[in-house]
Amino acid sequence: MAFILGSGSPRRLELLAQLGVTPDDIRPPDIDETPQKGELPRDYCARVTRQKAEAVTSNPEDLVLCADTTVVLGRRIMGKPRDAGEAAEFLLALSGRRHRVITSVALRKQDRLWQKDVVSQVKMKRLSDEELNAYLATGDWEGKAGGYAIQGPAGALIPWISGSFTAIVGLPLAETATLLQTAGYPLYKDTAS
């Protein structure tokens, strides 16, 4: 049985390492992540994660783990910004407000799929022009849902969260561990030999 991480995210790889898990292979799927018309944010996140898990090629005995993280303000899905201008637009919309971060994680083995969605609340402080421009200049917004990463410089902009910190980063560890154990992955195998 091979364990395949269906994600190119270095953050997910680092989070898996906290569980003592090293993927045998990394195969980021290439799927269309465009929200469907009228699709609710949690449904969108779950669908994209499921499609990612189904898109990764694997052998029948392999385990494939995929996840998707979505930043949501009201019903607005904030994906990865195309450029600094869109990142600024996202951050200004989030400034001084609470929003949701939804992370869906899926584990597939053959035709079996285990999936869990985790919804966390995040409050971003009211950003001054100086803070916004300084953060944009770091480039840390690139490739990040909502235009920020809580585990980087943007952590200074987040005074409050409710939920799972690791889910906000990109992979809810408690839920991921449960999925791995449910699928028979030897998560806490004896390493003292």
UniProtKB/Swiss-Prot annotation:
EC number(s) given by UniProt: 3.6.1.9
Q: Which InterPro entries match?
A: ITPase-like_fam, Maf-like
Name the reaction it catalyses.
dTTP + H2O = dTMP + diphosphate + H(+); UTP + H2O = UMP + diphosphate + H(+)
Q: Where is this site: Important for substrate specificity?
A: 11, 69, 151
What molecular function does GO assign, one term? UTP diphosphatase activity
Cofactor(s) recorded for this entry are:
a divalent metal cation
This protein's name:
dTTP/UTP pyrophosphatase
EC top class named in words: hydrolase
Q: Which family does it belong to?
A: Belongs to the Maf family. YhdE subfamily.
Q: What keywords appear on the UniProt entry?
A: Cytoplasm, Hydrolase, Nucleotide metabolism, Plasmid
This molecule's function is given as: Nucleoside triphosphate pyrophosphatase that hydrolyzes dTTP and UTP. May have a dual role in cell division arrest and in preventing the incorporation of modified nucleotides into cellular nucleic acids.
Name one cellular component (GO) term. Answer: cytoplasm
Catalytic residue positions: 68 (proton acceptor)
Q: Name one GO biological process term.
A: nucleotide metabolic process
The listed locations are: Cytoplasm
Q: Which organism is it from?
A: Ruegeria sp. (strain TM1040) (Silicibacter sp.)
